Curated annotation (Swiss-Prot):
<comment type="subunit">
    <text>Heterodimer of an alpha and a beta chain.</text>
</comment>
<keyword id="KW-0012">Acyltransferase</keyword>
<feature type="binding site">
    <location>
        <position position="220"/>
    </location>
    <ligand>
        <name>substrate</name>
    </ligand>
</feature>
<dbReference type="Pfam" id="PF01960">
    <property type="entry name" value="ArgJ"/>
</dbReference>
<dbReference type="GO" id="GO:0006592">
    <property type="term" value="P:ornithine biosynthetic process"/>
</dbReference>
<feature type="site" description="Cleavage; by autolysis">
    <location>
        <begin position="219"/>
        <end position="220"/>
    </location>
</feature>
<protein>
    <recommendedName>
        <fullName>Arginine biosynthesis bifunctional protein ArgJ, mitochondrial</fullName>
        <ecNumber>2.3.1.35</ecNumber>
        <ecNumber>2.3.1.1</ecNumber>
    </recommendedName>
</protein>
<keyword id="KW-0055">Arginine biosynthesis</keyword>
<keyword id="KW-0511">Multifunctional enzyme</keyword>
<keyword id="KW-0028">Amino-acid biosynthesis</keyword>
<dbReference type="GO" id="GO:0004358">
    <property type="term" value="F:glutamate N-acetyltransferase activity"/>
</dbReference>
<comment type="similarity">
    <text>Belongs to the ArgJ family.</text>
</comment>
<feature type="binding site">
    <location>
        <position position="446"/>
    </location>
    <ligand>
        <name>substrate</name>
    </ligand>
</feature>
<dbReference type="GO" id="GO:0004042">
    <property type="term" value="F:L-glutamate N-acetyltransferase activity"/>
</dbReference>
<feature type="active site" description="Nucleophile">
    <location>
        <position position="220"/>
    </location>
</feature>
<feature type="binding site">
    <location>
        <position position="307"/>
    </location>
    <ligand>
        <name>substrate</name>
    </ligand>
</feature>
<comment type="function">
    <text>Catalyzes two activities which are involved in the cyclic version of arginine biosynthesis: the synthesis of acetylglutamate from glutamate and acetyl-CoA, and of ornithine by transacetylation between acetylornithine and glutamate.</text>
</comment>
Length: 451
């Protein structure tokens, strides 16, 4: 499948009143190619007290019905918009959706029946503008346990819909509007082709937010993916789940899982061509690969914007007996506070990596002790791999510690991007997880969050 990409740079330098860090501006696109039939907007409402300028209400809408799918939080205290949107997709059988409305600054979580009424009110107000009943998904992000200023929000939905457009600036404003502690808006778009429709240019766009409460099973993470490719409602859930498991469920900032996680995919078919209706078709395989790669690239932006983070770290577990074992080991290492603080301190304390790998697969307290045949200490290898192409630094070889060159280790750990590779030596399966370090700023940001 032919794919087209674009360069990244931007004149955008602020997010609301806050300056975007110079090191993050390179991740903001200056142009984009957006899916046909979709429009987007981001407007200022003032949902969170103290916000006086940053857009905090977003709408993405299609000029025709879409096939749609969603992947949601597994947190038992799921937020009202999650409950509403999950039920709507089930009711509509993943068909006939037209729009997504999103507010930032308030999560509308743990807000009782009133919170569900507020989410419904947001959807119904948007439906009236779109002209279709039961056609709007709802997302919210922000502080938990407080009711939305719902009248203020619904009063601004008509304006948000009226201001929606298909230009790059419209999509960028939309991406800005869903941010909370993010330091930069996260937006991507690409064009691609499918095997059965050579010469037809399809487009996909995605925007996401998240900088804290990020862990597997998603976290305070909202994502909307939109494409003009023709995809049947029946195959939407599986193609999205496959992509999410290998992208948004493979990132960690702090190990906390939020009440509001939502990743939604909308496909309106506006570009034409043959509908992807079978999971056995070459088109399905091609789109699944494209969506997974696209989602992974978008998810990496969240890690790069981790609260207080100074490093982007890839945890790669290879030569595993099973893919699931590799995932669990990678996740355990990526989530370990001891590993993450050592990375911040440029400390080559590989014992912490081994420790996190060693407890990844053991049974929980109160359960029979399992043997964990997937991990054999005398077959395990650990290395630091620099991203500049230079030679990897071996820390552990077949269970035996290496004489580590501390100066070389410090050079690698000083890099903004680095990779930790764990070879289990028990099979041929692998998994990857993306994470960041823990710095002093993480505590400062989260200590001040409600203020």
């Amino acid at each position: 499948m032919k794919r087209f990409t674009r360069a990244y740079s931007s004149a955008t330098t602020t997010l609301g009143a806050a300056p975007i860090p110079a090191s993050k501006i390179k991740y903001i696109p200056s142009t984009g190619t957006y899916p046909k039939g979709f429009v987007a907007s981001g407007v200022f409402v003032g949902v969170k007290p103290g916000n006086t300028s940053k857009p905090d209400l977003a709408i993405i809408s299609s000029d025709r019905p879409c096939a749609a799918a969603g992947v949601f939080t597994k947190n038992k205290f799921q937020a009202a918009p999650v409950t509403f949107s999950r039920k709507l997709l089930q009711q509509k059988k993943n068909a006939g959706l037209r729009s997504v409305v999103i507010n930032s600054g308030n999560a509308n979580a743990v807000t009782g029946t009133g919170g569900l009424e507020d989410a419904t009110n947001m959807a119904r107000t948007t439906d009236q503008r779109v002209g279709d009943e039961d056609s709007t998904l709802v997302m919210s992000t922000g502080v938990i346990g407080q009711r939305l200023p719902i009248q203020k929000i619904v009063d601004h939905i008509p304006m948000a819909y009226h201001k929606a457009g298909d230009s790059h600036s419209h999509w960028l404003n939309c991406a800005k509007a869903i941010c909370t502690t993010d330091t930069f808006p996260k937006l991507m778009s690409r064009t691609f082709e499918l095997p059965s429709s050579p010469g037809v240019e399809y487009r996909i766009a995605g925007l996401t937010k998240g900088a804290g409460m990020i862990a597997p099973n998603m976290a305070t993470l909202l994502t909307v993916l939109a494409t003009d490719a023709p995809i049947a409602p029946a195959v939407m859930p599986n193609v999205l789940r496959h992509a999410v498991d290998r992208s948004f469920n493979a990132i960690t900032i702090d190990g906390d899982s939020s009440t509001n996680d939502t990743v939604a995919l909308l496909a309106n078919g506006a570009a034409g061509g043959k509908e992807i209706a079978s999971e056995q078709s070459p088109d399905f395989e091609a789109f699944q690969g494209l969506l997974t790669e696209f989602s992974a690239d978008l998810a990496k932006y969240i890690v790069r914007d981790g609260e207080g983070a100074t490093k982007f770290v890839t945890i790669r577990v290879v030569d595993s007996a099973t893919e699931e074992a590799a995932r669990q080991v990678a996740r355990s290492i990526a989530t370990s506070p001891l590993v993450k603080t050592a990375l911040y301190g440029k400390d080559a304390n590989w014992g912490r990596i081994l420790c996190a790998a060693g407890y990844a697969l053991i049974s929980p307290p109160g359960q029979p002790i399992n043997d964990v045949p997937e991990i054999v200490p005398e077959r395990t290898n650990v290395s630091f791999v620099p991203t500049d192409g230079s030679t990897e630094l071996k820390l552990l070889v077949d269970g035996e510690p290496e004489q580590v060159n501390e100066e070389r280790a410090s050079e690698i750990l000083a890099m903004e991007d680095l990779e930790i590779v764990v070879r289990l030596g028990t099979g041929d399966k692998s998994a990857v997880h993306w994470t960041c370090d823990f710095s002093h700023d993480y505590v400062t940001i989260n200590g001040d969050y409600r203020t």
